[in-house]
């Protein structure tokens, strides 16, 4: 009890330290900028600054809060990558602080909280994976608080956290919503079991009321049925493209990282087995309320998150695992029977898990990326250098792909020969192009080729593009056939109306074609490129 009280007394300083250290670490690792996948959110956030909203004005696969936060960051900081860098770094920092809080609430141990948080930071999820760390840490903290003191206020807090997770990505809300219901049903109370249905009803009602405004918005601008259908179509295409992976461990090129897949599944199963072993313990219902919801969420999240390629997807499943590891270690430290064997087995398992985490997260490579080894005595200079790079529009190390780097002369041409009202049709996975070009995307699609197809979606895109001014279309050669087959109506529109303006060679296999609308009358010719001007 004294240890638990001391942990609660010291948790705020440790949470602040976790926030500061993690935020600084993630910020300094942005030496090579954001991966192009992250620009799905940066570009969409930039689009929102013009008053164009997801679902109403452009396709949203179910991530409204990620888009809104990117927009808010750019509105506050400016339309530069620094805005997203601060958002993402602080989100990971907040996730670390909340993990400390969740584990202290769950175990009463500050040491285990620090260990769990260190593993979470070490596995290093991709920048766009910050919600998978942040919302799970926040909701697990709410779960643990409710188990420790089941009050109506904490029921509502759980509902708020779950709805926040839903708005980040809808499946997060589903997984964590189920976990919240299990937490309420399993938390021991003074009365009969049926009395737990009352807080469950409050939880469901609060969540429903909180999410109703968003559902009403979706119904108003497109309809819930159409939204759900489009989301399912998108999810199915993503699942077909990025399937769940069960890698070989022995003989694998990276056995420690591959082993982490099985460790992520083993941890919740072992936690449930340990729970069964405690079935005669007077604390069993309390343990069940702590473990079963997190284990259930872990298994659902594992199956959903752990997809190909593992190098980018595997770290996303870290939070349920480290929370359960902390709980298991606490049970091991409390063991009386077979204590030496339990501690030895637990130590070996922890070492294996830690080694897998460090390997999967490339911890030492990421530390090297911060340049702290080389300039450990000048941290402020390092921060200044990184900030300067993130404020530049075309800092070379901040450009995510060779194709986009090759388009910089085109972006500079757009500054000279187009207006902010002009849009770009992006026919391939170059989702970062509108952001660097400082031009909005057209047709309500950040890009074609990996987004929503189908005849209904294409007709909506055509209606939108006919109401917009779209002088240019950018078509990378590796997506040309996909546009022709999947977006045949868009392809027909482009062939009838656009002509080739120039080609940008990227590699022997990749060429980016820039098409121009042949029906638009130019005001003159650009002196540097001789391309048509439309200002």
What are the roles of these predicted feature ranges?
Residues 174, 300, 306-346, 362-368:
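Hydrophobic/aromatic-rich transmembrane helices and adjacent perimembrane loops
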Residues 86-107, 138, 142:
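Transmembrane-helix motifs of polytopic, lipid-linked glycan transferases
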């Amino acid at each position: 009890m004294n240890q638990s009280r001391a942990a609660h007394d010291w948790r705020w300083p440790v949470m602040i330290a976790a926030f500061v250290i993690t935020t600084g670490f993630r910020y300094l690792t942005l030496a090579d900028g954001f991966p192009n996948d992250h620009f799905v959110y940066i570009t969409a956030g930039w689009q929102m600054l013009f008053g164009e909203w997801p679902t109403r004005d452009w396709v949203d696969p179910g991530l409204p809060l990620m888009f809104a936060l990117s927009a808010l960051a750019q509105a506050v900081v400016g339309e530069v990558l620094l805005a997203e860098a601060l958002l993402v770094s602080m989100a990971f920092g907040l996730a670390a602080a909340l993990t400390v809080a969740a584990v202290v609430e769950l175990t009463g141990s500050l040491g285990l909280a620090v260990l769990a948080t260190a593993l979470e930071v070490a596995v290093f999820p991709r920048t766009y994976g910050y919600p998978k760390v942040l919302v799970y840490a926040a909701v697990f903290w709410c779960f643990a608080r409710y188990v420790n003191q089941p009050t109506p206020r904490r029921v509502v807090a759980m509902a708020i956290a779950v709805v926040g997770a839903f708005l980040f990505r809808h499946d997060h809300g589903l997984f964590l919503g189920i976990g919240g219901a299990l937490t309420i049903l399993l938390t021991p109370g003074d009365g009969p079991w049926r009395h737990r249905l009352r807080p469950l009803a409050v939880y469901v009602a609060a969540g429903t009321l909180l999410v109703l405004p968003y559902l009403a918005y979706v119904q108003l601008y497109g309809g819930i049925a159409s939204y759900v259908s489009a989301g399912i179509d998108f999810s199915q295409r993503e699942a077909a493209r990025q399937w769940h992976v069960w890698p070989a461990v022995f003989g694998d090129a990276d056995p420690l990282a591959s082993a982490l897949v099985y460790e992520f599944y083993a941890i919740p199963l072992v936690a449930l087995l340990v729970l069964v072993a405690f079935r005669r313990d007077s604390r069993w219902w309390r343990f069940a309320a702590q473990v079963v919801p997190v284990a259930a969420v872990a298994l659902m999240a594992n199956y959903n998150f752990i997809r190909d390629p593992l190098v980018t997807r595997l770290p996303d499943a870290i939070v349920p695992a480290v929370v359960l590891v902390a709980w298991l270690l606490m049970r091991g430290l409390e063991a009386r029977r077979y204590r030496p064997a339990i501690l030895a087995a637990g130590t070996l398992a922890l070492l294996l898990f830690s080694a897998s985490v460090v390997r999967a997260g490339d911890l030492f490579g990421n530390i090297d990326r911060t340049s702290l080894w080389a300039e450990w005595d000048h941290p402020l200079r390092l921060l200044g250098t990184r900030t300067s790079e993130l404020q530049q529009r075309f800092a070379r190390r901040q450009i995510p792909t060779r194709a986009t780097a090759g388009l910089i002369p085109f972006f500079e041409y757009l500054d000279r020969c187009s207006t902010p009202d002009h849009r770009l049709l992006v026919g391939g996975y170059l989702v970062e192009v509108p952001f660097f070009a400082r031009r909005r995307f057209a047709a309500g699609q950040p890009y074609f080729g990996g987004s929503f197809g189908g005849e209904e979606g294409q007709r909506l895109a055509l209606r939108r593009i006919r109401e917009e001014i779209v002088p240019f279309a950018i078509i990378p050669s590796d997506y040309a056939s996909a546009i022709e087959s999947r977006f045949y109506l868009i392809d027909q529109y482009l062939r009838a109306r656009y002509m080739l303006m120039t080609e940008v060679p990227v590699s022997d296999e990749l060429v980016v074609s820039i098409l121009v609308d042949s029906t638009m009358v130019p005001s003159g010719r650009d002196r540097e490129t001789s391309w048509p001007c439309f200002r």
